[in-house]
Every structure is written in structure tokens, then in C-alpha cells.
């Protein structure tokens, strides 16, 4: 492929990458009745009369230019027609399985019935950001409910009871405490409910007749206790939940995280990754060689940016009917400018690195680390990272006039993140959306123009040419 970026105003000082991905999706994963459509009968009388699911073009507008179906090659701006939607279903399934952050984003629709499908369920989607200190944060310390330490279920309470005879507060009284099999004598007591001299008065044991100090305690000698095995179980369940959070809970991720086995995509009935590649987008400075009346002097810098790539293909033998889809996306390095590095917030001894504490649970990442405001919101938890993650990763940052808040900012020379409000660990945050509009001269136009060439070499069980009459020579 050859790619040209919309004209940058300046030769931006940042890294841009163009990446490609190819996947195959068996038709049976996106249409439940595909095998019956091909002639399979589970019972002798089963019907094989099925039609491929369709998606009607939106009324009035048809499929618009730049839509997903435009990239599939469907005619645009024409309504009142329909086409089969196996490509759209495969696209959404690939997104769900390979590009969606399962902790922050809901699955998109993947119809598997006989249709018709709704075109608005199938739109262009943004990939997730590459993982760094912030984008790899978890929204919770473990993926599951917090595991409680099993301390038992109950402990008897002494000092509360009900009397069955009449007493006053200066005399001792016989009372029945929780689950008691015999009466207990309170030397001093106070009434809580009921009247002195009345039956079934609720009584609280006191320390002396002349004061109101209460003598109410939980009797831990008779409390139920947890066993060592129950405590071990609590620790191991917590470890499982933490591994689910770190490793993911798609089935293939569970197998890899818990059992150390990487299962082929096809065996787990999911889209299969075939290959791809990554290459840099090169930004070329262009120096003005003559002065103009508009005030730009000689040597004023503009730029153009291009990228080319080769050998991003794949070789694959298919053993069933599949759709093959290729994806191209552009990403930039993630650079920050509004946060206070965690290292600059450390105050106590235990906040420093200690080997003995290296394997504790996930630690909180605070909002001020990515977006400092000088308010109470700074201490809101943004997400959770592994213990001492700040020692393992150093986010890139910018300073000086490159900062977006400088009155004479040069931020159009960079692609650094600039948050207009406090970011949260959410679907919007995790989507890859580099601020390319900030650095190009025409932000309302497409950011990249691509010329893609695919060299198909197919080996198929079909004759080279269809010759009339050769019906018995397949």
C-alpha cells in the first residue's frame, strides 16, 4: 500500500505508524444456517432451502460515501437495493474478538440469523490504543466480587437479655441472653424497652447501679471460626480473579492465562489472524525558498507525509468456506502533558519500592497522574495497575511551548494527548484517536489517502477456464 497524509501545516515531531491486519472468518460463525444452506441435514426431513442474509441500503441516502459498506465496494448514494451481509457480520465479529477492550466496551451486534440485518448496526469502528501505563489500567483490582476472609458467621452477645420477672435497676436480675439454655444474672442493669415490673423487659447489663456504663460484649470464645483450608481457598479464589483481570476472559485468554496453552483460533471458533505488518509514516519537511506577501519568510517549514509497505500479506490454506478481510489503521505514539508522574507524589517509606511488597495486589492509579487539576478530583482512582508499575514504564511527555496550554503553543508540531476535561477509564478513552486534525491544514477532509494493491494468488479446485460442453471433465 501507498499512503499520503493530508498536508501537515508543519513537519510534526512525532511518530506515526500504519498497520495492517488480515483475518479469515468461516461463514458458519456469522450465519447459523450456513451448513444447512450448503446441504447439511441433521434429520432426513430437514429443509435446506435458505437464502444468504441481506442488508437493505438505507432509504433515501443509500450507503453513504466513507461508510463501512463503501469500503466493501457496495455502490453508494443508491437506495432501494440490498446485498448479502456476511462481510458486515464478519467485520463486527473480528472487532469483538480482536480489537475491542472487553473491560471497557460492550460487544457490537453480530447477527447470526437469516436476516435481514440493519445497516446502522454495521459501521466503521476504532481500534483500541496500544497498551501503556494508562491504557492498560484495569477498572478494578480483580475481575469478580471482592473475596472476604472467612471469619465465621456469628458470635454470641453477652450483656443483652430479656427478663421474665419484675425487678428494679438496683437489684440483680435473671435474664435470658441470645440462644441461652439457662438464665444469667445481671448484678446491675438498665431497661431499654418495656417497664420495670413488667414481664419481657429488654435489659442491658451495667457496670454499677450509679452510672450508665454498658457491659455489652461479643463472646469470641464461642464464636464460629474459619478453618485453614477456608482461608487458603479465599486466597486462591482471589488469585483466580486477579488472573482473570490481567489475562482476560475470552475463552482463548482464559486457556492461555490459567493453563499456559495457546489454542489455535480455528479450534476455538473465532476469527483467525492470518498476518499483517507495521510501517512508519515518514514526514518530510518542505522549506519555503521565496518570500511571499502573506508574511511567510524564506525557510518557513511546511511538510508532506507518506508511507509505503510491502510483504504485509499471508499464505494460508483454507479448509472451509471463509471470508477474508484486511484492515489498515494509523496510530501515533501516546504522549502526555497534563499529569503528575507518580514518582513526584511519593511521600512515605512504604510508597518506595520494597522487594517484600513487589507481589501485592493491584495498586490504584490516581487521576492526577494523567490529568492534574489541583482539586479533590486529583485523588479519584483512574484505574488499577500492577504493583510498582511506575518503575517499569515511563510515559513520554512534552514541555515548554509544545504544551497545549501555552499562549503561543506549538502543539501543532506534536500529536500529544490534550484532554479537555478529566478523562475516565472508559470506551471513549481507550479508542485510538490521534489528534491528526490538529496538525493538518484541512481538518474537515479525510486525514489519509490510500492506494492499496493486493496481489491475489489463488489455488482453487476449479478449471482454469469454463469451456462449454466439458461437463464431465472436472
Q: Model regions: which residues?
A:
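Intrinsically disordered, low-complexity segments
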Residues: 1-474
